[in-house]
C-alpha cells in the first residue's frame, strides 16, 4: 500500500526507510528475499535508510552476540547489504539498537576498525531514558551513553520512543501545570519532541 500511495510523487521528493527484520528466518535465502520484497512492495529501485533491525536482541536459542552473528555475519547478509549500498540500492545503512550494551559496543567497534561504515543508528532516546533507562530496567542502556558514543564517531542518530510509548504525553497534572506555566501554547508531547530534536546529530 505504501508503494502505491507514493507512486504519484517524484521519488526524489521523499525518503524511504525499512529494515532487515530476519529474527526468525535468517538464512541467506530468506534474508535476501526479504530485502528484494521490500523493493518490490515499495515500488522503488533504492531505499534511503536501511536498518539491521534489533541489534542487541536475543531469542530462546541465541545470546545477543550469537544472534547478531547468525543473522548478519555467518549468512553473509551484512556483506550483501554493503554491496547493495555500493551499488546505490541502499543510500544509507545503519542499525536499530535494543538491549545489550556489549552488542552496541561491538557494532561500533566494527565501524572503528573499518569493517563497516554505519551511516546512522537508531536508538531509544527521551528525557527520561537519557539518565534513567538502566535504573528503570537493568537490561536497558541510558540514552546519554548511546548518543554520546555516536557523537564521538560523527554517526547521526535516528530517535525511537521519543514519547516513551506515549507516556511522556500523559504526565501527572502537577507536572503538566508547570509546563503550561512555562509555555501555555505548547502541548505536553511537544516538550519531548523538542528535547530529542535539540540534540546535535539527530536526523
List the model feature ranges, each with a label.
Residues 12-24, 50-53, 123-125:
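A short, structured active-site edge motif that brings together acidic residues
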Residues 55-203:
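Beta/alpha (TIM)-barrel catalytic core signal, keyed to glycine-rich beta->alpha loops juxtaposed to Asp/Glu
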Residues 2, 31, 35, 74-77, ...:
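Aromatic/hydrophobic pocket-lining residues that form the small-molecule binding cavity
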Residues 12-14, 45-49, 91-92, 117:
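Short acidic capping loops at alpha-helix termini that bridge into adjacent secondary structure
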Residues 1-14, 45, 80-86:
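N-terminal binding-site loop/beta-alpha segment at the start of enzyme catalytic domains
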Residues 3-4, 36, 105, 194:
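Active-site phosphate/pyrophosphate- and oxyanion-stabilizing loops and adjacent acidic/basic residues
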Residues 23-26, 99:
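Glycine-/small-residue-rich active-site loops that bind phosphorylated ligands and cofactors
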Residues 31-50, 83-87:
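CE4/NodB-like, metal-dependent polysaccharide N-deacetylase domain
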Amino acid at each position: 500500500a505504501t508503494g502505491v500511495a507514493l507512486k504519484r510523487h517524484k521519488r526524489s521528493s521523499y525518503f524511504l526507510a525499512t529494515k532487515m527484520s530476519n529474527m526468525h528466518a535468517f538464512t541467506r535465502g530468506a534474508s535476501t528475499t526479504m530485502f528484494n520484497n521490500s523493493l518490490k512492495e515499495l515500488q522503488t529501485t533504492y531505499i534511503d535508510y536501511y536498518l539491521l533491525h534489533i541489534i542487541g536482541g536475543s531469542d530462546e536459542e541465541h545470546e545477543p552476540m550469537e544472534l547478531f552473528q547468525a543473522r548478519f555475519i555467518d549468512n553473509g547478509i551484512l556483506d550483501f547489504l554493503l554491496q547493495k549500498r555500493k551499488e546505490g540500492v541502499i543510500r544509507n545503512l545503519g542499525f536499530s539498537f535494543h538491549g545489550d550494551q556489549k552488542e552496541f559496543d561491538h557494532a561500533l567497534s566494527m565501524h572503528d576498525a573499518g569493517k563497516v561504515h554505519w551511516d546512522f543508528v537508531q536508538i531509544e532516546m527521551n528525557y527520561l531514558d537519557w539518565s534513567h533507562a538502566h535504573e528503570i530496567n537493568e537490561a536497558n542502556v541510558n540514552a546519554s551513553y548511546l548518543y554520546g558514543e555516536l557523537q564521538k564517531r560523527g554517526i547521526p542518530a535516528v530517535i525511537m520512543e521519543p514519547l516513551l510509548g506515549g507516556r511522556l504525553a500523559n504526565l501527572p497534572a502537577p507536572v503538566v501545570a508547570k509546563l503550561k506555566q512555562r509555555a501555555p501554547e505548547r502541548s505536553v508531547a511537544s516538550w519531548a519532541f523538542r528535547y530529542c530534536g535539540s540534540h546535535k546529530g539527530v536526523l
